[in-house]
Regions:
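Acidic, gly/ser/pro-rich intrinsically disordered tails
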Residues: 1-14, 29-33, 50-54, 77, ...
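Residue-level preference for beta-strand/loop junctions
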Residues: 13, 33, 59, 83, ...
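OB-fold and OB-like beta-barrel modules that bind single-stranded nucleic acids
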Residues: 17-21, 41, 81-93, 114
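Short aromatic-glycine-enriched beta-strand elements
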Residues: 27-42, 108-111
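Short beta-strand/loop turn elements enriched in aromatics
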Residues: 38-56
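A beta-strand/beta-hairpin structural motif
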Residues: 52-77
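Beta-rich strand-turn-strand
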Residues: 68-100
Length: 151
């Protein structure tokens, strides 16, 4: 059995991808009511070609990104198609059989279960707004109500 530290299994492959969002964020809910946001990121390698003295694109890789619970709500409000992002998370692979003529073959998809998502600040600026969770909001509302009733 794999060990776990802060929710990350030690045998998981954790990776960071810097790229562009290529699909609008979709929000759905599990049967238990947990929010799940998903989007796709494309990343391309770039290298300098000394012969042409120009930067050239290499292969492009696409990753489906899944965000859970509070992060899902934040991503829905913050991430849009075309946005440069940095995504850190656990790599997941899944195989889907696809028919190909007489013989079937398997297509392998690589997904990222996000630990963190943010804008790529090498390509722009951002403004951060801390989100207050329900328990904090309730506590502040009770404090205000107590102050108003005692005045």
């Amino acid at each position: 059995m794999a060990s776990t530290y802060r929710g990350v299994t030690m045998n998981d492959i954790t990776m960071t991808v810097v790229g562009n969002v290529v699909r609008d964020v979709e929000l759905r809910f599990t049967t238990a009511g947990d929010p799940v946001a998903s989007f796709r990121v494309a990343t391309s390698t770039r290298r300098f070609d000394r012969a042409t003295e120009k930067w050239v694109d290499g292969d492009t890789h696409y990753f489906s990104v899944t965000c859970w619970r509070g992060m899902a709500h934040n991503v829905v409000q913050s991430v849009v198609k075309g946005m440069p992002v940095v995504v850190t998370g656990r790599l997941r692979s899944r195989e889907v059989p696809r028919p190909c003529g007489e013989q079937g073959h398997i297509v392998r998809y690589h997904d990222i279960e996000a630990i963190a998502v943010g804008p790529d600040l090498a390509r722009g600026i951002a403004t951060f707004t801390r989100v207050k969770r329900d328990a904090v909001v309730e506590s502040e509302e009770r404090l205000i109500a107590d102050v108003l009733t005692s005045a």
